[in-house]
Regions:
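Portal/gating segments that form or line small-molecule/metal binding sites
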Residues: 5-14, 27-166, 176-215
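C-terminal segment of classical bacterial N-terminal signal peptides
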Residues: 17-23
Length: 215
């Protein structure tokens, strides 16, 4: 996959701290939300047939401002191995610091969990490897104190956690391009889950962001 694959997606760190609190809920365990931010083509594909997503990276002043504003948000990032390795090759570099300084600082600073059965260590700053069952570990993470959880890329994880009903919110960017073929974001999901559209925003580059919650 190209290094630019998730530059657009990783720029929008829109998950913010949203923990429950207050004296009236002191005995209730904190709950962290799990969100997804990803891009799809106009014909509904998450990647093309070669697993490339560089088509999702479209420069535009309005879009860039949106990315920079949201890059200061707090989240714990969640990845699959392929997405993690690609991110880890780019965001700690001088090129990332020069071209997208705010996003690079956020990506390097935030806590990161990568789910993998093959990785033994994760060298990117503030990263850890989780080899436990995906759904079990996500349930555990959501029950612990900390920033909300945000998945970037990682289509297989998104599909599995959607099937398990563990994702609370989806931010999906529809990019005005037709790929013709590829892989969908929800590959293999069964049961026809439905979602509620809670917000939309259109940008001058043609991107439309939809905020969805599970019905």
């Amino acid at each position: 996959m190209h290094r630019r694959t998730f530059l657009s997606a990783t720029s929008v760190l829109a998950a913010t701290v949203g923990l429950g609190g207050g004296e009236a809920r002191a005995s209730t365990p904190p709950v962290r939300t799990l969100s997804v931010f990803n891009s799809v083509s106009l014909d509904g594909f998450f990647t093309d047939e070669s697993s490339d997503m560089s088509w999702a990276h479209t420069q535009d002043p309005e879009w860039n401002q949106f990315m920079s504003t949201n890059a200061s948000g707090e989240a714990e990032l969640v990845f699959g191995r392929k997405t993690y390795e690609m991110m880890a090759r780019f965001w700690p570099t001088k090129e990332a610091a020069q071209t997208m300084p705010d996003v690079a600082r956020g990506m390097n600073r935030m806590r990161k969990t990568v789910f993998s059965h093959t990785l033994k260590t994760a060298d990117w700053e503030n990263s850890r490897v989780a080899q436990a069952d995906l759904a079990t570990e996500i349930r555990r993470m959501k029950s612990e104190p900390g920033p909300d959880l945000l998945i970037l890329g990682s289509g297989e994880i998104v599909a599995q956690l959607t099937q398990a009903g563990l994702i609370d919110a989806y931010q999906i960017v529809v990019v005005p391009i037709v790929l013709g073929s590829g892989r969908t974001l929800f590959e293999g999901v069964t049961g026809k889950p439905r979602f509620e559209l809670t917000k939309t925003r259109a940008f001058s580059n043609g991107n439309v962001v939809g905020w969805y919650e599970r019905d």
